[in-house]
């Protein structure tokens, strides 16, 4: 069977970054894969097999063409041509292939876009964002985590279709926002998202943002919708940090009542 590593792992390999999530595209169907691989085939209807080999998480998908979208779920047909498969992906930097011998194959100019630090949609960006508005947040996430610029045509489409992100589930929004808030460029990126009007659509505001290496410490600085999907532990940690911030100083009382961890995080803010 024809198989390639594709997506973020290859992009990060080129950037000399560590990555533990591996996406493999193959000409084999899930039924064929399960004859020689053991994994979770619960997504078999989507042509996918998940394998956990700590520290790696491996997703294997059959080459496919996406025919239509319904609430982010595409109708697909399985194909045998990897060149057609990569056309369905979001950005050129995520469509570079690596074969079994470690050779890099780039049909869409992704390597040059990595060199140029450019986030560029594959094909028509208007169609890409209408099909799946999550791609808008993914573009902004890569802008934050990779410190790349967004291609002009891609940015124009983001501005045109940004309202569509309001249709996304809060869980998917949080997954992307988590990564943005933990990025080195978080302040610059959040200011950029504010300028684009993205944060207004998401119902997120802030007066001042200070980068801290703690997710709850970042969220504690934001005003968020009441239904934002935090875990109970996250909710508790955020409320504690906000309580200390409102108190206005770090003293022995804060350390005694809340512990050194919360005192240190809040002290950085």
Which functions belong to the PLM regions below?
Residues 1-269:
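Catalytic cores of the polymerase beta-like nucleotidyltransferase superfamily
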